[in-house]
Amino acid sequence: MSKSFQQSSLGRDSQGHGRDLSAAGIGLLAAATQSLSMPASLGRMNQGTARLASLMNLGMSSSLNQQGAHSALSSASTSSHNLQSIFNIGSRGPLPLSSQHRGDTDQASNILASFGLSARDLDELSRYPEDKITPENLPQILLQLKRRRTEEGPTLSYGRDGRSATREPPYRVPRDDWEEKRHFRRDSFDDRGPSLNPVLDYDHGSRSQESGYYDRMDYEDDRLRDGERCRDDSFFGETSHNYHKFDSEYERMGRGPGPLQERSLFEKKRGAPPSSNIEDFHGLLPKGYPHLCSICDLPVHSNKEWSQHINGASHSRRCQLLLEIYPEWNPDNDTGHTMGDPFMLQQSTNPAPGILGPPPPSFHLGGPAVGPRGNLGAGNGNLQGPRHMQKGRVETSRVVHIMDFQRGKNLRYQLLQLVEPFGVISNHLILNKINEAFIEMATTEDAQAAVDYYTTTPALVFGKPVRVHLSQKYKRIKKPEGKPDEKFDQKQELGRVIHLSNLPHSGYSDSAVLKLAEPYGKIKNYILMRMKSQAFIEMETREDAMAMVDHCLKKALWFQGRCVKVDLSEKYKKLVLRIPNRGIDLLKKDKSRKRSYSPDGKESPSDKKSKTDGAQKTENPAEGKEQEEKSGEDGEKDTKDDQTEQEPSMLLESEDELLVDEEEAAALIESGSSVGDETDLANLGDVSSDGKKEPSDKAVKKDASATSKKKLKKVDKIEELDQENEAALENGIKNEENTEPGAESAENADDPNKDASDNSDGQNDENKEDYTIPDEYRIGPYQPNVPGGIDYVIPKTGFYCKLCSLFYTNEEVAKNTHCSSLPHYQKLKKFLNKLAEERRQKKES
């Protein structure tokens, strides 16, 4: 294009005030160049900058005219005379009268804000040397300036839905000016190109516009890294409020590039942040979703997303930045902000103010507040606050506050292990619904030592970092009211019970299991649950239990071809019997019973049998019968004594077993059984001396008198509590195998011959005198490969054995493997005998 055409174009544009920017095709760069001419006319730029603006106006005008566009640019010397006409460019009508009467400064500010520029952008541009600014590189410079501003860190005073009434409003320009801005934008930029970023309303009523803005932002790698700029005019303070002032609404856009640049954008402020910042700092659940984190300016849409956000490194970094902006604010008690506001007390991070001690008195009254800076980082070492500010408040509390841990097995042990090396633990409290724990040390120095250590060393629970700091809200933890004088037993609370799992179902004795733990210390008590393949062994001290656990962690424990899992029991700290101080005695009695089942003892049933046979062969069989009755009464008394001693322990063990696998046992208990309540109790029982009770029960059954029958019923009721592990002792199992098959073979001899000469079993004596068991209730001797009682295995969710209260998913396993097991056979025999007894009683009545 010729120079004359350019000059004539400029003349027409300066005289004609009705040119339309959209019709002329002016983009963002042309609009930005217009804004550069305004400060030149208003005297905000020096003389060199004015000449520079004139140069840029000429260059941009020439380039736009070459594309066929009609520019509305003017030189710096004539911009002051043509300001009103330039302001009207692109308008579809004259501006409101109130806007025309305003000063040039207000009009220029409106134009700059509408184009996405500010006076600070002009100041930045004025620092460039004149020889480096040319019409060719001016668009790139302007884009870099605008991108650099949008990349600055977000403000910390964003509002959010539902909570705007409790926070300080951000600074806004007067209402009439704001309406004029909106009117100007609405009239002037309806037909802008799609490449120009839209003007956004940051009222946070809707996140759709802002999210769309972030989607359309064009990030490039060639960002300006000239250094950090001062924000002297970014904030201003008033007497009672802390309002955030922005040069334009566009400075609230964008996300921070890094912590160094973030910290340079904010100045230290007095008092406390808005309530929305405090709530997000403590990670309180939002009232509704979607929710905008007022600290990070990040929208979240669910509880899971909110939990991940507050536990992330980005949120922790912004929280640390918030602490640096408000150095006087103490996040633990928030007294600098709420001054005892009851709402903040209810919304505190600890939902149990009645269990913990009273909060300490406020330290913010009467002077500037100096509060501790807890550890906020995920690694507990990267985001420490100024610990020296806490020295004046250390003596007020000895409670260590642990947050953001993940729950798992042995959680209490993991938490107490964090602070145990620093001193004696007086008390502790682990919250159920919130992942927070409070541990009270014996002295303040111990608590402070633990907190100081974890400011430099990461505190790990289950391999994941947690936050550890000294609680200033609670000085100590109250003890339960019912036990004011009871001392806290650290070893007792931590537990000394070893849990063995993945044990074989059968084929071993109690002593074989106890030998696994004997090398590590003295055994105080134990519970063996063969049907559940687990055992609980209580050691005399916790050190002995820990020694076994630590050793088995390093070297796997193998028992009868199975790798046994060994860990410290989380549910049971010790095995307590209902009768106090009987645990050791019962254990000794169990050991004595083991010794009683020696090879000599095994001969006693056979001797008794031979004596009975000899007495029956004599001419006076009544004498042998009297001897049998006496021996039966003696055995009954011994059995009754043993049962009265062991009944409390068995009941307790059944409760323990029910609590071991609550989820597993719930399905078994809630699903009804036709056998009755006694069979359910039988599944919950656990016994370690069943081998002796079986021969004694046989001796009881030899008594045919009515009194012995009543006593037999009592013994049977107690005995049914012990049916889960019939083979509790190896020797007992051998005795059962030696005596019961003999007795059952005698029954088989009775069936075809109807001969009463062979009465080795006391039950046959009873049947001979009073009643003979019908064939439908008879059961032959136990044979491992012959299943019995298959009718009691019924299909439900799987295949449920009503006798044993067990579920199986495989029918073959249920009806072949399970029904061929010894415990199932013994329960089937008991049940059939019970039915036969009930039928006999009905006939007698």
Swiss-Prot record:
Per the record, the zinc finger regions (Matrin-type) lie at: 799-830
Record CDD domains: RRM1_MATR3 (cd12714), RRM2_MATR3 (cd12715)
Query: Where is the stretch described as Disordered?
Result: 147-174, 187-213, 342-394, 588-785
**Could you confirm whether the keyword rRNA processing appears in this record?**
no
Name the lineage. Answer: Eukaryota, Metazoa, Chordata, Craniata, Vertebrata
Protein name per the record: Matrin-3
The record's section on SMART domains has: RRM (SM00360), ZnF_U1 (SM00451)
Broad class of the protein's primary localization = nucleus
Its function, per the record, reads:
May play a role in transcription or may interact with other nuclear matrix proteins to form the internal fibrogranular network. In association with the SFPQ-NONO heteromer may play a role in nuclear retention of defective RNAs. Plays a role in the regulation of DNA virus-mediated innate immune response by assembling into the HDP-RNP complex, a complex that serves as a platform for IRF3 phosphorylation and subsequent innate immune response activation through the cGAS-STING pathway.
